Amino acid sequence: MARSTKKGPFIDGHLMKKVLAAKEAGDKKPIKTWSRRSVIFPEFIGLTINVHNGRQFIPVFITENHVGYKLGEFAPTRTFKGHKGSVQKKVG
């Protein structure tokens, strides 16, 4: 179910502080976060955010097309290696 529009988008406070500090300083160093649930705001454009996927941090460079999505959408947590296929036995 989608979030109610009257509540507005969600962002963790500590992440917003880090983003604003990086924008003020003009720092291009990646921001490390575990907050996959935070919505991407226009202030994030041009920054690289390392999003944790449960095992490692995935770098996500934020562009205008990312605004409105959640950070977790760009760091997949599951790897699909394919279904087990029929194994061909060698004859001979």
From Swiss-Prot:
Keywords: Ribonucleoprotein, Ribosomal protein, RNA-binding, rRNA-binding. The gene is rpsS. GO terms for cellular component: cytoplasm; small ribosomal subunit. The lineage of its organism: Bacteria, Pseudomonadati, Campylobacterota, Epsilonproteobacteria, Campylobacterales. GO terms for molecular function: rRNA binding; structural constituent of ribosome. Protein S19 forms a complex with S13 that binds strongly to the 16S ribosomal RNA. The keyword Ribonucleoprotein applies. This is Small ribosomal subunit protein uS19. The keyword tRNA processing does not apply. PANTHER family: RIBOSOMAL PROTEIN S19P FAMILY MEMBER, SMALL RIBOSOMAL SUBUNIT PROTEIN US19M.
